């Protein structure tokens, strides 16, 4: 194997792929990146056995084909530290990788390409082409509500549900739920659900950087695959049953509050400073045309904010974890937001005013 490549051309796919590679690995080969030269294309592959990412780059010069694995982190650090306009020459000689650039020379240890595990590919049952920017928005609007290390392992991921002309993302940690839908060219009538693990979905969002570009998504029995011109991303799916999210969406709330998103966000942020550091509880008191927000903590410190809102219902007092409310307001983009409530023991439904492709549910807190 022997090829030359500009530093920039190598660094971009290398940084993408190195993001998947975990530093602490039980198998030494999993800390490595697989380099494969075929014709005038170099592909780089990283995996942690759950997520696999292949980055592709065209070589300008004719190259000698071959395949080898080298430590991902070290190769990336070397490339980062070279001058921007460096031309890198890489060849394999007697189980070592020799890298030359200008007056710099590096020799890296290698492991054979045969040792590198591949994610098993099953048949794909459903394929669709989506705009990268729309899929990224879908993920970013819902990923914050995923659980982190819940024993209910199916919550440590995101539900992707396809039905005719619609792709929907749902995530929940049992205390709050986020849901966002987009139109998608899907012919299939039946609903099809998959759960993508947390690391996989966050990694996928990181890859969708081309505002004009498309991405092809394949949903299989045990895998999801996303392909663009520059990369192929594969993730195993979580084997489990996601909760019936439609049962969680509050129905029939009769108290509608409309307020300025930024003003609410700032008021919640200020009040949060004096909320209980562990439970983060704040109290909302609604009356006609106004919302009072209160917090206190074990040190008997108190914060209170008053904010004007559009509200005409009866008065109501309800408690929430302020972090959950701030997370929701943080992903919304409209000037006005809707808050739909029914009573102090029922969940709140939050939506952007004038846009119902996203819905957020937050359970109340007893204060």
Please provide the spans of the model-predicted regions.
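Structural preference for solvent-exposed beta-strand-turn elements
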Residues: 1-367
């Amino acid at each position: 194997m022997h090829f030359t490549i500009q530093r920039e051309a190598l660094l971009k796919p290398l940084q993408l792929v190195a993001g998947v590679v975990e530093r602490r690995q039980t198998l030494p080969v999993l800390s490595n990146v697989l380099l494969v030269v075929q014709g005038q294309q170099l592909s780089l592959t990283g995996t942690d056995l759950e997520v696999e990412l292949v980055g592709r780059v065209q070589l300008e010069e004719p190259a000698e084909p071959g395949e080898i694995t080298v430590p991902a982190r070290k190769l990336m650090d070397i490339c980062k530290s070279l001058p921007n306009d460096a031309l890198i020459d890489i060849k394999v000689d007697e189980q070592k990788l020799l890298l030359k650039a200008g007056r710099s020379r590096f020799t890296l240890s290698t492991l054979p390409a045969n040792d590198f595990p591949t994610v098993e590919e099953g048949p794909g049952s459903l394929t669709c082409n989506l705009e990268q920017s729309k899929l990224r928005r879908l993920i970013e609007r819902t990923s914050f509500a995923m659980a982190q290390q819940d024993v209910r392992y199916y919550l440590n991921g995101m539900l992707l549900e396809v039905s005719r002309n619609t792709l929907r993302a749902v995530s929940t940690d049992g205390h709050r739920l986020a849901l966002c839908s987009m139109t998608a060219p899907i012919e299939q009538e039946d609903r099809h659900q998959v759960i993508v693990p947390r690391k996989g979905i966050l990694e996928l969002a990181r890859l969708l950087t081309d505002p004009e570009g498309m991405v092809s998504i394949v949903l299989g029995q045990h895998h999801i695959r996303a392909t663009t011109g520059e990369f192929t991303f594969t993730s195993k799916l979580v084997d489990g049953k996601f909760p019936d999210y439609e049962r969680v969406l509050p129905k029939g709330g009769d108290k509608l509050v409309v307020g300025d998103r930024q003003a609410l966000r700032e008021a919640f942020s200020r009040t949060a400073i004096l909320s209980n550091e562990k439970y983060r509880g704040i109290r909302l008191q609604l009356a006609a045309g106004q919302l009072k927000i209160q917090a206190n903590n074990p040190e008997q410190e108190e914060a209170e904010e008053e904010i004007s809102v559009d509200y005409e219902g009866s008065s109501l007092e309800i408690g929430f974890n302020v972090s959950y409310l701030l997370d929701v307001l943080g992903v919304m983009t409209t000037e006005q937001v809707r808050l739909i409530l029914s009573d102090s023991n029922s969940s709140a439904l939050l939506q952007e005013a004038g846009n119902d492709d996203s819905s957020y549910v937050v359970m109340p807190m007893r204060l």
